[in-house]
Amino acid sequence: MKKIVLSCLLAGSLGFSLPALAQGDYPTLSQLNQRLQTLGNQASVELKSLTKTAGGKDIWVLKVGTGNLDEKPAIAVVGGVEGFHVLSVELATQFAEKLVSEHAEKLENTTFYIFPNMSPDAYEQYHAALKYERRGNATAVDHDRDGTAGDNGYTDLNGDGFITWMRVEDPMGDYKLSEEDGRVLVKADRSKGEAGNYLVFKESKDEDQDGKFAEDLKEGIAFNKSMTFKFPVFEPLAGDIPVSQVESRAMLDYLFEQWNIFAFVTFSPANNLSSPLKYNAQNARKRVVTSILQKDEAINAMVSGMYNETISQKAYQQTNQGTDGDFFQWAYFHFGRLSFGTPGYWTPDFKGKDNPEANYLAWADSLGWNEVFVPWTEITHPDFPGKKVEVGGIKPFVMVNPPFEKVGEIAEEHTEFILKLAEMQPKLEIQNLEVESIGNGLTRISLDLFNNSPLPTHSEMGERSRWLRKIRIDLNAPNDRLISGEKIQLVDSIDAFGKTSLSWIIRGKGDISMKAGASHVGFINKTFNL
């Protein structure tokens, strides 16, 4: 209770209130923008709109820190990579608010880049009159390549304001009722001799009469399906080329100029924090690497352990460790940074039900959540004359986004995790310094440049990347005084709690200075009195 009261006092002193205590549902874009503008008024925060989407929505970034922000190691926190994952936007935004109001001391050593919502066009569907789990932006796209954009999307057949499912009784169907819960449909296992009873489609009509349903949605390109790593060519929502949208291009252009980022935390369906990625030697040796590298696997496992110690919810059915064209994998494979992803929330294991939907419904029933399921109701469907068609199923959003009153605790735990990760950032120190006269007016300077951190200065993937700078050591000595050693030295990487040894021989008296580091590990300066 004391912690909550203190948090409220701190937040109030900065001009904003903690949203988890102030409202009953996820914010609208207007409410979110107001909170971001309030944050942008703080001295430690720079709020910038990178661009506007096809729907006219701002893509915001918050750069949070003090002093020389660009020469401190940084963490990038990303929300809204999937438009239907509204929780992710709130977690990123609340992290920014808590960072500024409750943890300002962390800004002395670390800079934070926070991208609260990369899919604002799709996010808006949560508050629209017709609710469905949208991924694409507002760009007009012909997903089925029939010459007309968005001509066969969803249809609210029962008029309840939600897009759920429709099932058609058909002895040649692929689906049957689940034995775990009769409200749920599962694919019949033909290898076990199971017969199907239903055809299953998203709630829609065959508007273009091509025999397909909801294959040309009235939405554009999905941010989280259009990155360069394993780009899913010719798939709906991906576009014709990677990074084709103004928001994805603007973000990547911005990131390529932020040399100090050492790690990403992305709130998305992909999860390598509950369970770390596994190294695959064959995939790691390919020309196009598709496996986490061996040293980075160990880092992922260590950070995953810290995450599981920090987060109270135990992992269940967290099998998504990246999908083609997603941002989480791009940040590692193509940008060379440590990349960590988590949805932040999932349905817990309940009553031993294997099917995710059956498990969710059993859990929801136990909590008295009666508004999460649309009962199957028969309708008349123009595309299935003479057949029994029913509409129903789990409502959109509820399986991936908890009730808003639970978000405060989730945000608190994930803020704690991100700040723990910041404490692990690479940290250069000078150890074993010796300045000794060796006669004839010469002085030898020797030292160890030590990385006092459980993380290496570079991920193994980052060592291969042109987008992660090497450690540079500059000795400010006149050429005629430097007898031995290099004025400029580059070091590929320093291991966790590792070192690199340096030595110079200098002629004469007078101060000599040294600067060592890189933007993503920070810089240290030292003056030697000779």
What do these predicted ranges mean?
Residues 449-464:
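Short amphipathic, basic-aromatic surface patches that mediate peripheral association
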Residues 510-521:
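Short, aromatic- and glycine-rich surface loops/edge beta-strands on solvent-exposed regions
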Residues 481-509:
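Intrinsically disordered, low-complexity Pro/Gly/Ser/Thr-rich segments with frequent PxxP/GP/PP motifs
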